[in-house]
Amino acid sequence: MTKPATTPAILALADGSIFRGESIGADGQTIGEVVFNTAMTGYQEILTDPSYAKQIVTLTYPHVGNTGTTPQDAESWKVWAAGLVIRDLPLLASNWRNKQSLPDYLKENDTVAIAGIDTRRLTRILREKGAQNGCILAGADATEEKALELARSFPGLKGMDLAKEVSVKERYEWRYSLWNLETDSHPEIPASELPYHVVAYDYGVKYNILRMLVARGCRVTVLPAQTPASEALALNPDGIFLANGPGDPEPCDYAIRAIQEVLETDIPVFGICLGHQLLALASGAITVKMPSGHHGANHPVQDLETGVVMITSQNHGFCADEASLPANLRATHKSLFDGTLQGIERTDKVAFGFQGHPEASPGPCDVAPLFDRFISAMAPVVDR
């Protein structure tokens, strides 16, 4: 197969590093924080994860696009990643579920992307210097000077509240479960078969989190990020779920206030990723920006109570500071990569959080039993 003519593209980092390659997405420009993800598969799930808003994602696996794309693998209604960086795009996408090639998918979603660069060199820079502000410039008139100027214009994620930007604007009900191989679909479960009612705060929720809850018997009501606690509690939930999301948790004062009000009740609370960080802030801890963050599907995490080590999917650039935990908040999990805090639990309430992604998508589901723990916490209320 003859390789088609390509459009030039440039990736510039704020430190002055320049990478020339070819465009595989939309023409134009994009700026954001450049991070690297070590997952070998799941590029469509990564692109559509709202937690990647304002981030340009570098995939360290060299061949990306082999299996094309399918609507069934999307984790939200659009691509949220600010841009994509890869080493090599295969000429053919081959998979029985493939509906659209990766380049066509990127163009349809107006996503700027670059291929043909040395991603190993780029990853070393990001690993040694930390996440960098950057720019991808795609088009025949792209220049290094312009790309560098744009890269340095990005203010960074510190202090940036993105949860309210990616959140839904109106509440909705979710009853779709995990993918069924026989029907090749995500089946919709009748409300009569879902005994638990969970209210989920959407700070950038992934579809597979909602599916995991439904698969365990939950009818889920998804609320906008800025919904007051009074409105959430008026729905008479059996449990409150705090979703994942992008950006810095500290500016999300509306969410912190709402969680504090929820914690005044006896309703079980479970937080993932940004939701975990917001639970920590609402309980009196502080959060910090990490040098490189955790982005991948192979991160070992240890359960501090049992000693069990689990391989987890991770995607975060901020974390709760363990040294700041108040007396009523204890550490439950730690990263074996860098020792950062991965799990917390209130000692005075039925409330806990996990920094990684138990729902995976992509990645392993070693930590999925945390969903079962949430169900068990709600069971006494439902059984009464």
From Swiss-Prot:
Q: Which residues bind L-glutamine?
A: S51, G245, G247, L274, Q277, N315, G317, F318
Q: Which UniProt keywords apply?
A: Amino-acid biosynthesis, Arginine biosynthesis, ATP-binding, Glutamine amidotransferase, Ligase, Nucleotide-binding, Pyrimidine biosynthesis
Q: Which GO terms describe its molecular function?
A: ATP binding; carbamoyl-phosphate synthase (glutamine-hydrolyzing) activity; glutaminase activity
Q: What class of enzyme is it?
A: ligase
Might you name a Gene Ontology BP term for this protein? glutamine metabolic process
| Pathway the protein contributes to | Amino-acid biosynthesis; L-arginine biosynthesis; carbamoyl phosphate from bicarbonate: step 1/1; Pyrimidine metabolism; UMP biosynthesis via de novo pathway; (S)-dihydroorotate from bicarbonate: step 1/3
- CDD domains to which the protein is assigned, alphabetical: GATase1_CPSase
UniProt record similarity statement: Belongs to the CarA family.
Asked if the keyword Amino-acid biosynthesis belongs to this entry, the reply reads yes
Q: List the EC numbers from the record.
A: 6.3.5.5
* NCBIfam families per record: CPSaseIIsmall (TIGR01368), PRK12838.1 (NF009475)
User: What is this protein identified as?
Assistant: Carbamoyl phosphate synthase small chain
Tell me the active site: C273 (nucleophile), H357, E359
Q: Which reaction does it catalyse?
A: hydrogencarbonate + L-glutamine + 2 ATP + H2O = carbamoyl phosphate + L-glutamate + 2 ADP + phosphate + 2 H(+)
Q: Give the Gene3D superfamilies listed for this entry.
A: 3.40.50.880, Carbamoyl-phosphate synthase small subunit, N-terminal domain (3.50.30.20)
Segments of this protein annotated with the region CPSase: 1-193
Q: How does it assemble?
A: Composed of two chains; the small (or glutamine) chain promotes the hydrolysis of glutamine to ammonia, which is used by the large (or ammonia) chain to synthesize carbamoyl phosphate. Tetramer of heterodimers (alpha,beta)4.
Q: Is ATP-binding one of the keywords UniProt gives this record?
A: yes
